[in-house]
Amino acid sequence: MTRGSTSQSVLSSVRDLLPEVAAAAAEVDRTGVVDRAVITLLHDAGYFALLQPPDFGGLDADPDIYLTATRELSSACMSTGWLAGWLAVNNWGLSVRDVRVLREIWGADPRALLCSSYAPTGRLERVPGGFRLSGRWARCTGAPYASWLSVAALKVGADGAAQDFMAVLVPRGDYTVQPTWNGLGLRGIGADDVIVTDTFVPEYRAFSWLDMVPDAALPALQRLPQPTLYTLAGTMPLLGAAHRALHAASDAHVTARADVELSMMQIRRNVAEQLDCVRGERYPDAELMLRTRRDQVMAADRALRAVEVVVDDAGIEPDEPLLERIWRDVQTARMHVASNVEQVLTVVGRHSVGIAVDDLIW
């Protein structure tokens, strides 16, 4: 990224990389590795700076630029788009944390990347000056590419009972990456397990997930509700893969194309409305949050169905490795919690008839 780069110039630079990314997709699938040189090229293009805070070299971009770039990367190679999208959104998640940890991470290395898992499979115990952390987290996308880890853990009291749901930041030297990822698809995302054993975590690196409220002085991008971009990070790759499959299809598949286009329109509308809320110093209400989550999960489902329609019509033949790979990738991506259609629509339905709902799905 050059001085004076804009978010639109970043999108243009990412598009320039797409032929190279697409040409490498079969090799990524075969070896299970996205070349680190591609990550460097995405850094150079400014992709990972899109969601970084301005005080640390970020661009404070319109989130639609990030969503579009991630979708187009995924159209070229879904493993690359999924990996890059999650590494980038973790930059955004970090941006609302204590400024001391931002300085610790990006002050030392402006290109530092984080992997994450927010399944609360860790245990935090209070000690002087902070906590002791132990745990194991499965399927942390990008673990081999990251120099920091962001994970969820339950803070427990002296009696062992859970007291809080915390997010914790851990440097690379304090955790172990166990190479376990061997998915049916998305083979290049490096979603390995990470292990932390009785590691000290300073107070400023641990945050209450339930009580976290972004500073009103932060840019609007950083004040978007946390679930919004995190769930979309799991959906843009599916939409990108669907676009590629439809483009490769010999038939028109008009309905499937319309469904994918509709999904992008709904996503853009919802994110724009959330931005309007935070710019007006209002938190998006339950109606908007649930509609955003509904449309996001339906977009994931429509993308999956679009790929299945193409594959069902064409069949998966030995001379169609592209469709075969895309099919495996989307079947793997659908397993992510962000794409749990039944859970989300059940909650939306309960809310629509006046039943109280658990807002953690937001």
Q: What is each residue range found by the language model?
A:
Residues 2-4, 17-25:
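Generic N-terminal amphipathic, Lys/Arg-enriched alpha-helix
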Residues 7-11, 32-36, 228-239, 253-264, ...:
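Amphipathic, non-membrane alpha-helical segments in soluble helical-bundle scaffolds
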Residues 17, 235, 242-245, 249, ...:
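Amphipathic alpha-helices that form helix-helix packing interfaces
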Residues 22, 26-30, 262-301, 308-318:
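C-terminal helix-coil-helix/basic helical segment that borders enzyme active sites and/or dimer interfaces
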Residues 34-44, 48-146, 163:
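Glycine-rich flavin
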Residues 139-177:
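A short core secondary-structure module
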Residues 183-265:
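Glycine-rich beta->alpha junctions and the first turn(s) of the following alpha-helix
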Residues 314-362:
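Glycine-rich phosphate/cofactor-binding loops in nucleotide/flavin-utilizing enzymes
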